[in-house]
Swiss-Prot record:
It comes from Rattus norvegicus (Rat). This is DnaJ homolog subfamily B member 6. One of its GO terms (biological process) is nervous system process. PANTHER family: DNAJ HOMOLOG SUBFAMILY B MEMBER 2, SIMILAR TO DNAJ HOMOLOG SUBFAMILY B MEMBER 6 (HEAT SHOCK PROTEIN J2) (HSJ-2) (MRJ) (MDJ4). Residues 120-243 are annotated as: Interaction with KRT18. One of its GO terms (cellular component) is perinuclear region of cytoplasm. The lineage of its organism: Eukaryota, Metazoa, Chordata, Craniata, Vertebrata.
Length: 357
């Protein structure tokens, strides 16, 4: 026999909020539109999930189920006999699981095309057929929302819609979608709205997320994140982090920081010309060398008195020069030779005279 608690994956003491969360998770998991390759199994599971939610979400039905099981809901007690007064004397009839699903999601089936108005119907003027004839398919638009967090009481489980495309001027087109959901109470409330504009051939998408009192706005251009603000203030760190998460390059920052580098060179210019005057002072040492030249002696020699000059001339006459000495000695030698020659001749004459005698 099927255990409804096991079908939803909750404990027997689970709260009504836990029952809702469990149904949302299991219904989206086993919806036939999401399981085209295993449709029969998905339909069986989807039906069990709807039955479990119908019983466990109603306090009276849950109490009977806890006491007598599913048979108590069918109008009979256990042990083959009727031992209690069942409020469902003729048995409880389960509703269509699709009806349960649509009711849970605000009266509309998120997997049907009726839930998402085709934005191109009115724009191109060719509806694909009556709303009731639109069939579900594996490529259902809602499959993108299967990862949304739990819905809570007090809010529609899921609410979204599109406005048809329309002209905005300058060849622009626009669409809009929104979603809101929350947990228990207002603390976990989250709202997402997305608007898309096609202006001058560029697709501008603005995504606004409001969660726990904080507003986050992301603006994309042709799929590239261009700006991100939190509570109306641009957050460059959050923008860079989101771009890294998406694997996109971080857009160029605003021109605000650019002037800062431009000021640095202007401030650095005055110090650089400072060393240039130093080489200009190098010729200074040439001026200092002029006083070191001694006075010329010529002017002092001209001022010597005439008497001193005459005394010097007399001294020069008294002292023979170096050139005179060699001439005197040479003369003496020559005179000595002539004298000896003459003496020899005289002696020869004397000898010859003696021999004659």
């Amino acid at each position: 026999m099927v255990d409804y608690y096991e079908v939803l994956g909750v404990q027997r003491h689970a709260s009504p909020e836990d029952i809702k969360k469990a149904y949302r998770k299991q219904a989206l998991k086993w919806h036939p539109d999401k399981n085209p390759e295993n449709k029969e199994e998905a339909e069986r599971k989807f039906k069990q999930v709807a039955e479990a939610y119908e019983v466990l979400s109603d306090a009276k039905k849950r109490d009977i189920y806890d006491k007598y099981g599913k048979e108590g809901l069918n109008g009979g007690g256990g042990g083959g006999g009727s031992h209690f007064d069942s409020p469902f004397e003729f048995g409880f009839t389960f509703r269509n699981p699709d009806d349960v699903f649509r009711e849970f999601f605000g009266g509309r089936d998120p997997f049907s095309f009726d839930f998402f108005e085709d934005p191109f119907d009115d724009f191109f003027g060719n509806r694909r057929g009556p709303r009731g004839s639109r069939s579900r398919g594996a490529g259902s638009f809602f499959s993108a929302f299967s990862g949304f967090p739990s819905f809570g009481s007090g809010f529609p489980a899921f609410d979204t819609g599109f406005t048809p495309f329309g002209s905005l001027g300058h060849g622009g087109l626009t669409s809009f979608s929104s979603a809101s959901f929350g947990g228990s109470g207002m603390g976990n409330f989250k709202s997402i709205s997305t608007s898309t504009k096609i202006v001058n051939g560029k697709k501008i998408t603005t995504k606004r997320i409001v969660e726990n009192g904080q507003e986050r706005v992301e603006v994309e251009e042709d799929g590239q994140l261009k700006s991100l603000t939190i509570n109306g203030v641009a957050d460059e760190n959050a923008l860079a982090e989101e771009c890294r998460r998406r694997g996109q390059p971080t857009p160029a920052l605003a021109p605000g920081p650019a002037p800062a580098p431009a000021r640095v060179p202007s401030q650095a210019r005055p110090p650089t010309p400072a060393p240039t005057p130093a080489p200009a002072q190098t010729p200074a040492p040439s001026v200092s060398t002029r006083p070191q030249k001694p006075p010329r002696p010529a002017p002092t020699a001209k001022l010597v008195s005439k008497s001193n000059w005459e005394d010097e001339e007399q001294d020069r006459q008294r002292v023979p020069g170096n050139c005179d000495a060699p001439m005197t000695s040479a003369g003496l030698k020559e005179g000595g030779k002539r004298k000896k020659q003459k003496q020899k001749e005289d002696s020869k004459k004397k000898k010859s005279t003696k021999g004659n005698h």
